[in-house]
Amino acid sequence: NSPNKYFYTQERTLTRKKAYFINGGAGRVVASIPAFEKLYETDKDFIIVCEGGMDFYKGHPVLHELAYDNWHKNLFKDYIKDRDCFSPEPYRVWEYYNQKCSLAQAFDIAINNEGLRDLTDPTIHMNKQEMVQGFKVIEEIKAMTKKDKVVVFQPFGRTAENMGDFVIDSTSRSFHLNDVIRICKDLRDDYAVVVMSEFPITIEETPTVPIAIPQISDVRVWSSIIQIADHFIGC
């Protein structure tokens, strides 16, 4: 009975549908998109459990309907229970930590196991309202700073923490606060600087060239702002 039970279990494992858990910040979520697009070419029955939020899968022609917020009603009972679960980790991919591939390619290797290959750029599908909101923000900042060129600066990663007057990132995925201030001061001579940060940053202001730190909670609007801006610096 034992061998039969083994082969039965193995067969069930090979035919079971899959659930992929994606965690972390916006960069990781966006970087996973090309890998899932590739997976969809051969498997249309997987789901994505969005531990880091599903904002960047919204509006995608194929991934939106496969993506579930981790608070989705009856997620475990209706969607996960009968699936095999995977948590792809691009930072653990050999090609990535040996600097032979991008984060998107590392996701592709972890998810599709097809080795290193060329991928399309990840695309965020935004609606007209989001694009208009981003355009308005950019125009307001240009008017405020009297600058024609706009640079968006995202200095802190998802793992950064605000500790009093300091912003600390134990994983070293963020700029040091002193460097953030220095970069902002250098950039504002030539650009309208927009800082994308949930943490307060004190930068010595000049009356003629202020630095914008808009408190916008919607990351999709931020995506629109970044797309319309002339340059983006991020970590």
Model-predicted segments: where are they?
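Catalytic machinery of carbohydrate-active enzymes
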Residues: 1-235
